[in-house]
């Protein structure tokens, strides 16, 4: 990462942050005016900040350099040729019809064809990062800019594009 910074690129992409050295180099590069994009294995935005802290990233560096954390997941898309209403959802309630996978020739018997992405964005403002870096027990969904992963997944289930099991 340090050798890349010397070439003065506008954007630096770090494939994956796995160790303290890579985390520190990426954070330092962001302080020199470079846009740094990186991947990190974490369950959500809050745990991504905690993971960086666990890797030894200095709190002050995190406060200054994180612009946003985007968390993404892929859900399997229900096959429209064979999806079927979820059994037990025949109640006369004001809830949308939910569907489950069935399986047909179009989807090779899996009940799913393709994938769809769900996302959540955690703004990297200093107050948010400080709360998470200090490991305070703050519900991440209160800090989000938009919907949580769960809300996005439930929305797709309600629209019939994926199953509740996804």
Where are these regions (language model features)?
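Short, flexible helix-loop junctions that flank or precede catalytic/ligand sites
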Residues: 1-166
């Amino acid at each position: 990462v340090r050798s890349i910074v010397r070439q003065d690129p506008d954007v630096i992409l770090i494939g994956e942050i796995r160790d303290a050295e890579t985390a520190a180099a990426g954070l330092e590069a962001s302080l020199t005016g470079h846009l740094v994009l990186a991947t990190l294995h974490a369950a959500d935005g809050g745990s991504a900040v905690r993971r960086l802290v666990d890797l030894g990233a200095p709190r002050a560096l995190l406060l200054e350099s994180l612009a946003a954390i985007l968390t993404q997941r892929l859900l399997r898309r229900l096959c429209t040729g064979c999806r079927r209403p979820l059994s037990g959802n025949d109640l006369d309630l004001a809830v949308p019809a939910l569907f489950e996978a069935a399986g047909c020739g179009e989807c090779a018997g899996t009940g799913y064809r393709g994938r769809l992405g769900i996302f959540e964005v955690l703004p990297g403002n200093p107050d948010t990062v400080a709360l998470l870096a200090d490991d305070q027990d703050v519900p991440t969904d209160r800090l989000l800019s938009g919907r949580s992963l769960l809300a996005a997944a439930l929305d797709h289930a309600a629209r019939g594009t994926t199953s509740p099991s996804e």
